[in-house]
Amino acid sequence: MWGGREGAEYDSSKDLNAAFNRYREGLDTVAGYIKSRGYNLRIGLEPKPNEPRGDIFLPTVGHALALIAQLDNGDVVGLNPETGHEQMAGLNYTHALAQALNAGKLFHIDLNGQSGIKYDQDKAFGHGDLASAFFTVDLLENGFPGGGPRYEGPRHFDYKPSRTEGMEGVWESARANMDMYLRLAEKAREFRADPITQELMEEASVYELAQPTLDPGETIDDFLADRSAYEDFDADAKGAREYHYVELYHHAMRHLIG
């Protein structure tokens, strides 16, 4: 469900509080109807920052997640993020997918190519920000490094063939989407399986981040009593350590272009 009509060109033209209330009620009504009839359907909202409206409501994944959290029937409402739509707002598409996964709301995806903050280009997947496309595929195919929810849905491409293409070119551009995805998937699997990658992720504390703040059964009082967390914490030693972020990223790029 793409709310491309819902928005404004002029801030004076809408009671924004009322607009969000009606938007929420409309979604809840449709979601409630689906559930009341026992239909095996879910609603996937597709955020977009602008075009055709000057400012579209729910412009990003984060905005949509906030509204979904207010719904009475939000269990059947999730997200269908599009690569270009997040990148039109200057945002990281892979992060958007990750947050939707983390919230249990990644129902579908629309993959395509976008070259920066401009109109919605809908180019073939990977024909925009190639590095971002690589990490998107890495997440979709390999999951989070420390484990967690996985996307099990279709790999869907929402792109437009160039207006300069004839019928043969239209089909070639369709194949380009799938070819790019499969090539990136192979490279992403090789990247994750590489022992150097795993060593660098360890040094970068990627795996450590997967550890919860409190251990199983640990209480806030236990945490406060742990002197290693504050009183005996060696800030100088922590500050002097190397994280190898650039080396890890460069290693990913070697896999991508090697």
List each model region and its residues.
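Gly/Pro-rich active-site loop or hairpin
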Residues: D11-F20, G54-L65, D75-G78, H85-E152, ...
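Acidic carboxylate-rich catalytic motifs and surrounding loops in phosphoryl-/glycosyl-chemistry enzymes
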Residues: E46, R155-Y159, D194-L200
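C-terminal extensions of enzymes
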Residues: E165-G258
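Conserved beta-strand positions
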Residues: M1, L45, P81-T83, L111, ...
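Active-site acidic/histidine proton-transfer and metal-coordination neighborhood
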Residues: M1-G78, E208-T213, D234-D236, R241-H251, ...
